[in-house]
Amino acid sequence: MNAQTQASKNALHKSLERRHNASTSLAALWRPALLQAFVKLDPRQLLRSPVMLVVELTAVLTTLLCFVPDQAVPTSVALQIALWLWFTVLFANFAEALAEGRGKARADSLKAGSQGLSANKRRADGSFESVVASSLRKGDVVRVQAGEMIPGDGEVIEGVAAVNEAAITGESAPVIRESGGDRSAVTGNTQVVSDWLLVRIGANPGESTLDRMIALVEGAKRQKTPNEVALDILLIGLTLIFLLVVVTLKPFALFAGGNLPLVFLVALLVTLIPTTIGGLLSAIGIAGMDRLVRLNVIAKSGRAVEAAGDVHVLLLDKTGTITFGNRRCSALYAAPGVSGKELAEGALLASLADDTPEGKSIVEYLRILHPIEEPRREELTPIAFSAETRLSGVDWNGQVYRKGAVDAALRFIDLPREKMPEVLSREVDKIAQSGGTPLLVVANGRLLGAIHLKDVVKPGIRERFAELRRLGIRTVMVTGDNPLTAAAIAAEAGVDDVIAEATPEKKLARIRQEQGEGRLVAMCGDGANDAPALAQADVGMAMNDGTQAAREAANLVDLDSDPTKLLDVVQVGKELLVTRGALTTFSIANDVAKYFAILPALFVGIYPQLDVLNVMRLQSPQSAILSAIVFNALIIVALIPLALRGVRVQAADASQLLQRNLLIYGVGGLVAPFLGIKAIDLLLTAVGLA
C-alpha cells in the first residue's frame, strides 16, 4: 500500500471518528457559546442585527449616565438598568452562538477529513502527477485507485468502482459509481474501496458539496434570506416609530411640570422595541439550517429552504418515493390451453438471463413454487432488454423465449390485442387496475400467459400525504406507468393527481403550468433528463448518487439519495417560517402590552388621570422601568429553546395554523408582560432593589 493510500485511509478514519465524537448537545456547547456571546459584543458583528445594535448603544449610554449624578435616579437603580441592558445583548448573542455552535461542531469534523488530501492529476501528455487536492480546478482529470480518497466533486469518465461515502452520508455500505448513466457523479472526500476511476473535477475550490455543507452549518457566514431582510426592515421601522414615541414623552412631561430622567427614557425605548425577535432572528435561521443538515440535505442558499416552507405542489416520482421500487413477481396466469408447468418453464427461461430485480424475483418465485430442471447458463443466448423492443429473454436449442410489456409481446408474435384470449385479457386489466405491472410470456410464436409484478406502496405514505393536504400542499405522482396502473397506485397512495407515461418534457410543462397559476413547485430527480425540471422548480432536490447535471441544476442535494426526504425538507421549511412568524407575533404583542403596562406607571405622578389605566399598580416608576428591563432580558432566555427547536407544525390548513399561533403567541405575548413584570416588581421590592 502506497503512502497516499495509507494517508487517505487515515484521513477517512479520523474524519469518521471525529464526526462520531462531535458533541452537539446543548450542555457541551454552553461554555464556548458564553465566550462567543462576549466576542459578539463587537459592534461590527452586531451590524447584522440592527435592533440589538440599538440595545448595545443604549447600554453604553446608560453605563455612562451612571457616572453622571442625577437626584431623580439613584445610582444603584441606574447601574441595575445598565447591567440588564448588557444582559439583554449578551442573551441574544448567546442564542446565536449556541445555534452556531451546533453547526460548527459538524463543520469541524467535516473539515478534518479534507485536510492534507493529494490527487493524481493527468497531464496534457497523458501521464499523471501528484498534486495537492486544493489546487485542482474544474475540468481537471484525476485517477483514483482503490484505497484513495476522491479529491473533489466530479463526473466519472472511465472505470467502475465501489465507493465508500460514509464521510459525507454516514452510510457505511459502499455504492457503485461508473461512467455514463445516472451513477456517474462522485463526491469529494469519499473513498474508492475497489478498482479505479478516472474523474473529471466538476467544482473549483470552495464550490464542492463538502464546501457548501461546511458553509451551510457555519451559520455566521450565511447570507440573509429575502424574508429575513424584509423582517429586518419591519423591525427597523418599528424601532424608529418607538424612538419617536419615546422622544416625544420628554416634552409632554416638561409641559406638565414633571420630569422623566434620561435613563428611564433610554430603558423605556429598549422595552418597547422588538428586542425579542430581534435577538432571536439569527438563531432561528441558523437552527433551521442545522435541522436541514441533520437530515443530510445541503442547500445552495437559504432561499430554497424558505421556498420549501411555502410550496403548494409536490411532484414526486412513484418509484423509490411512493413505492419501494423493487417490483416482485406475485402470480402467474396461464393462457387457455397452456398448462401451469409450461408457463412456469417459459417464464423461468425468459428470466434466467435477466439480472434486473424484477427478473431475479421471477426466478426466485418459480424456483420455490414451480421447481423445474434448469439449463446451464452457458447453453443460453441471452437477449437483453432494450427500449426499442421492450422485451428480454433467451434463445435456447432453437427455441425463442421472451417476456415483456403487453403490447410489445403481442407485437413480437403478431397477435392483435383484440384477438388476445378474453380470460387472459381480463387478468391483464385486473393487474394494471390493481397497481401492478403485467408482463406477457411468449415462446416460439405462442402466448403462454401473464406475470403479475407488484410494486408495494410504502407504509405510512398515505397518512403523510393526508398531512400535506391539510397543510394546503397538493401531491402529484410522476410515473412512466400506463394510466391504469398509475391511477391504481395513486388511489392506494392517496396522491391528489398523477402524471402517467411521464417524460422530462411533461414534467417541465407541468411545473411551468403550476407556476403560471401562481403556485410554488417542489420536485426531486437524479438523472440528466431531470435537470431542466429541477432548474425550473422553485425547490429542486437532486440525489447525491445522481448525475452531475442534476446536482448542478438543483438547489438542494440529498446526500442519502432518499427521494422521500423532500417531504421532510418541506416540513423543515414550514417550521422555519412558522417559528419566525410566531416569535415575531409574540415580540410585537409584548411591545404593545409593555407600552400600556409601563407608561401609566411612569406618568401617573405627572398626569393623575392615567391612574385608571395603571392596572398593574407597580410600586414606583423606578420599579416599573427596572421590572420591564429585567422581563425584557429574561424572555429572550426563556425563548431560546423554542428558537433552536422550532415551532412544531401540526397537520392543519393555513387558517387553523394562523388562529392557533395567534392564540398562543399573540394573546400569550399580550398577557405575559403583565404577569411577568408584576411578579418581578414584587420580587425587586421585596429584596429592596427598587
UniProtKB/Swiss-Prot annotation:
A GO cellular-component term linked to this record: potassium ion-transporting ATPase complex
Matching InterPro entries: ATPase_P-typ_cyto_dom_N, ATPase_P-typ_P_site, ATPase_P-typ_TM_dom_sf, ATPase_P-typ_transduc_dom_A_sf, HAD-like_sf, HAD_sf, P-type_ATPase_bsu_IA, P_typ_ATPase
SUPFAM superfamilies: Calcium ATPase, transduction domain A (SSF81653), Calcium ATPase, transmembrane domain M (SSF81665), HAD-like (SSF56784)
Reactions catalysed, as given in the entry: K(+)(out) + ATP + H2O = K(+)(in) + ADP + phosphate + H(+)
Domain of life: Bacteria
Enzyme class (EC, first level): translocase
Swiss-Prot/TrEMBL keywords: ATP-binding, Cell inner membrane, Cell membrane, Ion transport, Magnesium, Membrane, Metal-binding, Nucleotide-binding, Phosphoprotein, Potassium, Potassium transport, Translocase, Transmembrane, Transmembrane helix, Transport
Binding site for Mg(2+): D526, D530
GO molecular function terms attached to this record: ATP binding; ATP hydrolysis activity; magnesium ion binding; P-type potassium transmembrane transporter activity
Annotated active site: D317
Protein's name in the database: Potassium-transporting ATPase ATP-binding subunit
Gene that this polypeptide is encoded by: kdpB
